[in-house]
Amino acid sequence: MFNSTALVIFAILFLLISADAFPIPSPNGEIDAMLIRNSIIGEDEDLMPTEISRRVLMAQKRYIGYETLRRDMVPCQKPGASYYDCRSGQANSYSRGCDTITRCARDTNDINT
């Protein structure tokens, strides 16, 4: 009789100890995993705008060509020309039309203000 009682007590103690070592998955396990994932994704809110921009550019996988990265590359051989189209003439040539509102080099005495 003593051996059977000791065996039952030993079995109960073994089950209690093993319950801590091998947890039974709860139905909330999936919910907990989703909450952890959302908290990891939510960490992006604290990032600097430059870090967010860097991550967006990395995700788009757009690359700068090697020609662009060369130091000795001159976009336009004509001095003073615009780098965009290499046309002759100044890059920022000042030319403005003459409208009534600008009051440019003409008789503006007849304009009612």
UniProtKB/Swiss-Prot annotation:
Main localization of the protein described in the UniProt heading: secreted
Residues flagged as site, Required for proteolytic cleavage: 54-55
Post-translational modification: Proteolytically cleaved, probably by S1P, a subtilisin-like serine protease (subtilase).
Domain of life: Eukaryota
Pfam (any one): RALF
GO cellular component assignments: apoplast
Disulphide connectivity of cysteines: 76-86, 98-104
An MF annotation (GO) of this entry: hormone activity
Propeptide intervals in chain numbering: 22-58
Compartments in which it is found: Secreted
BP GO annotations: calcium-mediated signaling; cell-cell signaling; regulation of growth
Entry keywords, A to Z: Disulfide bond, Hormone, Secreted, Signal
InterPro entries: RALF
Signal sequence interval, chain numbering: 1-21
PANTHER family: PROTEIN RALF-LIKE 31, RAPID ALKALINIZATION FACTOR-LIKE
Recorded family membership: Belongs to the plant rapid alkalinization factor (RALF) family.
Function: Cell signaling peptide that may regulate plant stress, growth, and development. Mediates a rapid alkalinization of extracellular space by mediating a transient increase in the cytoplasmic Ca(2+) concentration leading to a calcium-dependent signaling events through a cell surface receptor and a concomitant activation of some intracellular mitogen-activated protein kinases.
Record's protein name: Protein RALF-like 31
Species in which this protein is naturally found: Arabidopsis thaliana (Mouse-ear cress)
